[in-house]
Amino acid sequence: MTYFFETYGCQMNVAESASVEQLLLARGWTKAVDAQTCDVLIINTCSVRITAETRVFGRLGLFSSLKKKRAFFIILMGCMAQRLHDKIQQQFPRIDYVVGTFAHARFESIFQEIEQKLTQKDYRFEFISERYREHPVSGYRFFASSYSEGSFQSFIPIMNGCNNFCSFCIVPYVRGREISRDLDAILQEVDVLSEKGVREITLLGQNVNSYRGRDREGNIVTFPQLLRHLVRRCEVKDQIKWIRFVSSHPKDLSDDLIATIAQESRLCRLVHLPVQHGANGVLKRMRRSYTREQYLSLVGKLKASVPNVALSTDILIGFPGETEEDFEQTLDLMREVEFDSAFMYHYNPREGTPAYDFPDRIPDATRIARLQRVIALQMSTTLKKMRARVGKTLPVLVESRSRNNPEELFGHTELGEMTVLEGKVDPTYIGRFVDVQVKEVRGRTLRAHLVQERAK
């Protein structure tokens, strides 16, 4: 049997696709070259923005037509499967399985059915989307591993769901309430990843700061405590050198977490701290639970406590009722903080969220124009910061040969900056940490030459 994945959306979706792929590989399945030749097509979907849903609907139309010409199975999973299951089943009856975010335990039986070549039919599981308030976490299952074969990086989901209910966000309605993974399960996955040669891990959650797992005695483990446990575990085999985490809600960024980042050298000095907006009135309507001043205070603490810390963020432009003055306050905040990078987007109405019914929607032309100004400002700041790296010696994790020149190697810095090692570089450095000296910036990539391999 052969399979192929199409994955849309966040890093959590990427991790969950990798986890499902592990189940398939364990059953002896192999990856197909493309979606047109596979026995089973798995589409992992996102509902955060309407553009992602529109693209998936287009793909479903294409693949439904393809099923008229050849027999294969289509599995739809992820947030669209949870949110729009009835619409999808009605509009695309040739889809074989629709697996929502609370139905991960179904995959083993689905794959067994496919292997037995059962007659294709509509498959419906017990959806929880309308009842998650009574059963907030009952159906969610963490996978054992999100490892991708041959990769030196790996995601580790540590929690799922969100209790914040920002007025614009669909995530709590498709992911449910927060649930945290037990400490031992996370540590066991770290051990497995170390054995497989992984050098860098990224902890995932809709709000990792609110992690509240349990140890084997049943005691609550906070997120800073989890990080310290992970660092100590990684020190044992000394294979995993860099630990990242996303995403962090500003209201839950504690002094203990800031101190932990400052004290532990394996924690990357890059913190993703979504601000969303720079005007207090908009932040209040967004239900973000902090003010502009509180956010800037957190940034000040981070910069004072963690030398050379880099900050990334999310910026949401064109929220209902946003005035020109509100927008200018966002630009001012960006200039003051000087984010190293940002995910920038304009407001997308999501049916079922409180903001969907808010008055004073911003015209499309205004939203787009404001977003372009935000992007231009951030690109200028990012370029300035990257140019400041020229001449400096930085650690880099070498990932692969360069796609443009196989004699050169490709990797990334601790801050996630793409880096090309120029000249003929020994390919045995792939999967290792090296020191490089930055020569120049091309586009959004650092060009550098090898100095030496870093001490183990």
UniProtKB/Swiss-Prot annotation:
Residues 1-116 form the MTTase N-terminal domain. InterPro entries: Elp3/MiaA/NifB-like_rSAM, Methylthiotransferase, Methylthiotransferase_CS, Methylthiotransferase_N, Methylthiotransferase_N_sf, MiaB_methiolase, rSAM, rSAM_horseshoe. It catalyses: N(6)-dimethylallyladenosine(37) in tRNA + (sulfur carrier)-SH + AH2 + 2 S-adenosyl-L-methionine = 2-methylsulfanyl-N(6)-dimethylallyladenosine(37) in tRNA + (sulfur carrier)-H + 5'-deoxyadenosine + L-methionine + A + S-adenosyl-L-homocysteine + 2 H(+). The gene is miaB. This is tRNA-2-methylthio-N(6)-dimethylallyladenosine synthase. Belongs to the methylthiotransferase family. MiaB subfamily. Monomer. PROSITE patterns: MTTASE_N, MTTASE_RADICAL, RADICAL_SAM, TRAM. Residues 148-384 form the Radical SAM core domain.
